[in-house]
């Protein structure tokens, strides 16, 4: 049951304002476009100005890389207590072919209760939830304890340089728990899949298309690697089974280019090299070093039977599987808040990919709960949307969860 103070906090979440804020953010094109130099910068400027105006604190804007900025702010209650981080990202993926959209991808149009646009659920809606949660605590007049740390970072959709820079600069050192409002239909996601990213280069020997025997075709060798990796994937699925929340592991070839960028392709030329990127998603029963060793072993086996087989495998990113238990204070606070705000029992789940919370958990040991508005399987698709009712529900749950966590928890990192 909500207390009188919590009812005041819920009332401080203005639904119309929340929707307008989300629309404003969606209308800012924060797709990373190297050809034009477009980045998250305009979104960062908007958010920083909002924080100054609405929270009365000075945000910190820092470059994680040239033109790629994080915006950070701390709202302090003035009373001793934990530090709760509200984390989000300002970058969005490309809208792709606009003819596949039935709405303007940056129009933030609302039709039949759905707010459409690129990044509407992933995750401009979540950023708006974080901002209004912080403001409700700061301005409602309801007493609270501890601090809120807003960390709204760049490049989550890339190599996550934003959250890595945030951590390296010490902004997570005093954080006791983190809420990540990624699109999860307001389900409480206790775990996140791991990820291993790999780059494959297969080297052959160029030849005329009419005389392929005078060369070595890298594409046929790459095809053997694809099939061998698929067999390993099938064996791992059989061995691990389906994780309760994360499902099955996977190995996906996401990019194949032959010849690689910079070498013009010609119909009558057998290329001398092929490039591939592989996205490997892992579950709790898998050890990353064992997976890496197995993939290296596959290449060694293929090379042992083909003297012309030459392939290099470089692992360019490693994101471990992370998980927290239902007994974590931030989970308890969020579960009870969800039940009391909505009248429904919480649904527990896992994130099918990684989030910025992966590194907060893996590098700093911070309990991270991922739960935010938006369809779980819609991000990165055309006609992306967030349900307005789900958006408002998320903000109301968040403000109660934050208040309960800060009131009942003792900082594990400082006091």
Regions found by a protein language model. Give the residues of each.
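Acidic/histidine-rich catalytic neighborhood of metal-dependent amide-processing enzymes
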Residues: 123-194, 237, 406, 413
């Amino acid at each position: 049951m909500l207390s009188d103070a919590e009812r005041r906090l819920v009332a401080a979440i203005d639904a119309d304002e929340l929707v307008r804020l989300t629309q404003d953010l969606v209308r800012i094109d924060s797709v990373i476009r190297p050809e034009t130099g477009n980045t998250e910068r305009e979104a960062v400027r908007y958010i920083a100005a909002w924080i100054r105006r609405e929270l009365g604190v000075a945000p910190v804007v820092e470059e994680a890389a040239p033109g790629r900025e994080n915006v950070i702010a701390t709202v302090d209650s003035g009373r001793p207590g934990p530090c709760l981080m509200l984390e989000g990202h300002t970058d969005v993926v490309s809208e792709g072919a606009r003819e596949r959209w039935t709405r303007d991808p940056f129009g933030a149009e609302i039709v039949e209760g759905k707010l459409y646009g690129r990044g509407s659920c992933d995750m401009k809606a979540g950023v708006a939830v974080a901002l209004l949660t912080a403001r409700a605590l700061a301005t409602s007049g309801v007493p609270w304890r501890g601090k809120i740390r807003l960390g709204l970072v760049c490049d989550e959709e890339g190599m996550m340089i934003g959250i890595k820079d945030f951590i390296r600069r010490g902004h997570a050192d005093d954080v006791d728990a983190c809420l990540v409002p990624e699109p999860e239909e307001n389900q409480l996601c206790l775990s996140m899949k791991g990820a291993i990213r790999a780059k494959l280069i297969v080297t052959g020997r160029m030849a005329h298309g009419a005389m392929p025997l005078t060369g070595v075709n890298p594409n046929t060798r790459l095809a053997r690697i694809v099939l061998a990796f698929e067999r390993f994937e099938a064996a791992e699925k059989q061995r691990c089974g389906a994780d309760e929340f994360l499902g099955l592991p996977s190995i996906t070839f996401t990019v194949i280019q032959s010849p690689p960028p910079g070498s013009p392709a010609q119909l009558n030329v057998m290329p001398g090299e092929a490039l591939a990127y592989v996205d490997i998603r892992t579950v709790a029963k898998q050890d990353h070093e064992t997976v890496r060793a197995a993939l290296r072993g596959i290449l060694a086996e293929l090379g042992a039977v083909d003297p012309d087989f030459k392939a290099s495998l470089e692992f360019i990113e490693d994101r471990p599987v992370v998980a927290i238990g239902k007994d974590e204070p931030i989970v308890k606070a969020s579960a009870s808040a969800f039940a009391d705000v909505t009248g429904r029992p919480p649904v527990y789940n896992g994130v099918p990919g990684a989030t910025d919370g992966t590194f907060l958990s893996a590098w700093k040991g911070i309990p991270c709960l991922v739960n935010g508005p938006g369809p779980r399987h819609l991000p990165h698709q055309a006609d992306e949307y967030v349900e307005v009712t789900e958006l408002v529900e998320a903000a109301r749950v968040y403000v109660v969860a934050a208040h309960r966590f800060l009131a009942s928890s003792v900082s594990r990192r400082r006091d």
